[in-house]
């Protein structure tokens, strides 16, 4: 897979070499240049502004610095980078049909944007796995801030390794209509095994595998949060936390589905192009259309966050409070409350739930001891320190010492 417009120029190069000429077949008329200029400019502006605001909302507010949001910062940075370093260059390349930037940037242009695509999808995968551990296995250790940063570094390292062949084999070829940046694979045109193997490998690692992992994780999460009945304490606060947890999962499912839809035509196109080269007249317009769809994935996430998350919405309203038709509302929603207050409130709520559970357990044991002596089971939701629902887990009614340990 190639992340830039050099794919169309690969076909132009191969065709012109076979015909013994050096004429660029993909010169565009002015009206097409104008349309693509507007289309790609929208992506760049919305993506850069939106993702920078997302990073600011999370980094500048302590209340937003959670494991999931750290990965969202990484995702926003990857998408902003892809928009800045890839979309802008493709825009100018499509207008002038000439590579002005030399061999070094040709290699970087093929290498870094693909690294960003890898990082984007694996950041989503990390978020899905973190949500899975938090909700399905709440008693297991969670990622710390340091561990999260290490995972992010591992994701980028893996992304750089996977994108290395694109940077290594990128080359500049002089043509009469202008230089082109293309991938000069070591095998011949008749035997394109290197390219074909790489395309299939990338398709599996950047699309199929992570989406399978994400799909399985959110399936189990959905079964826990929606399919399971929530017994026990029916306080408003308790159910508000469950609803909040569901909203986060819904938001991330929308983000992943958007990414999958935007990038599917792009991956299919490159697989087909690898197996059968296309040099038809409509090739360039078709390529630019699916490239625009793929690149547009970088601008949707900030919009999704703003629509589906209250805190992100507050942050966006605060940034655009200068607009006459936007009411900023209460900016304090992003600020951190007193840590002592939050801990006290959480502890009191947890103690109340523990006392209710223990009382219910003892009463149940007294009633059933005369009949069969069997211990009953009940479903309870373990709560995190901030009051959010962690998971539905089974606890034996006769293990009252478990609750005592948690209380301590």
UniProtKB/Swiss-Prot annotation:
Gene3D superfamilies: Rhodopsin 7-helix transmembrane proteins
GO biological process, one term: positive regulation of flagellated sperm motility
GO cellular component: plasma membrane; sperm midpiece
Cytoplasmic topological intervals: 56-65, 130-149, 222-250, 309-408
Renumbered residue ranges of the record's region Disordered: 366-408
Its membrane topology: Multi-pass membrane protein
UniProt KW Glycoprotein keyword: yes
Function: This is a receptor for the tachykinin neuropeptide substance P. It is probably associated with G proteins that activate a phosphatidylinositol-calcium second messenger system.
Name of this protein: Substance-P receptor
Organism: Aquarana catesbeiana
Encoding gene per record: TACR1
């Amino acid at each position: 897979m190639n992340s830039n417009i050099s794919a169309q120029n690969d076909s132009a190069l191969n065709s012109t070499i076979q015909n013994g000429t050096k004429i660029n077949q993909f010169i565009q008329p002015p009206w097409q240049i104008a349309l693509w200029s507007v289309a790609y400019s929208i992506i760049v502006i919305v993506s850069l502004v939106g993702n920078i605001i997302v990073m600011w909302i999370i980094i500048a507010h302590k209340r937003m610095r959670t494991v999931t949001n750290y990965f969202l910062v990484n995702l926003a940075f990857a998408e902003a980078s892809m928009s800045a370093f890839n979309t802008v260059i493709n825009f100018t390349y499509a207008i002038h049909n000439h590579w002005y930037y030399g061999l070094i940037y040709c290699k970087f242009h093929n290498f870094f944007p693909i690294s960003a695509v890898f990082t984007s999808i694996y950041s989503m995968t990390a978020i899905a796995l973190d949500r899975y551990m938090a909700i399905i296995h709440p008693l297991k250790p969670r990622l710390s801030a340091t561990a999260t940063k290490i995972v992010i570094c591992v994701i980028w390292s893996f992304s750089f390794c996977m994108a290395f062949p694109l940077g290594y084999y990128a080359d500049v070829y002089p043509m009469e209509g202008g230089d082109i940046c293309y991938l000069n694979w070591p095998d011949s045109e008749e035997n394109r095994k290197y390219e074909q193997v790489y395309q299939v490998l990338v398709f599996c690692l950047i699309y199929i595998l992570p989406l399978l992992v994400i799909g399985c994780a959110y399936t189990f999460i959905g079964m826990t949060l929606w399919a399971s009945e929530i017994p026990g304490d029916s306080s408003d606060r308790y159910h508000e936390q469950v609803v909040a947890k569901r909203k986060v999962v819904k938001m991330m499912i929308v983000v992943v589905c958007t990414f999958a839809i935007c990038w599917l035509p792009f991956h299919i196109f490159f697989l087909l192009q690898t197996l059968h080269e296309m040099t038809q007249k409509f090739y360039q317009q078709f390529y630019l259309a699916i490239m625009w769809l793929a690149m547009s994935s970088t601008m949707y996430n900030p919009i999704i966050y703003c629509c589906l998350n209250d805190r992100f919405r507050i942050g966006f309203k605060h940034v655009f409070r200068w607009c006459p038709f936007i009411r900023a509302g209460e900016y304090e929603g992003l600020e951190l409350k007193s840590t002592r207050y939050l801990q006290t409130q959480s502890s009191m709520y947890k103690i109340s739930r523990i006392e209710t559970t223990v009382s219910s357990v003892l009463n149940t044991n007294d009633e059933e001891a005369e009949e069969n002596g069997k211990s009953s089971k009940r479903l309870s939701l373990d709560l995190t320190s901030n009051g959010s629902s962690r998971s539905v887990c089974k606890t034996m009614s006769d293990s009252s010492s478990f609750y005592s340990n948690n209380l301590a």
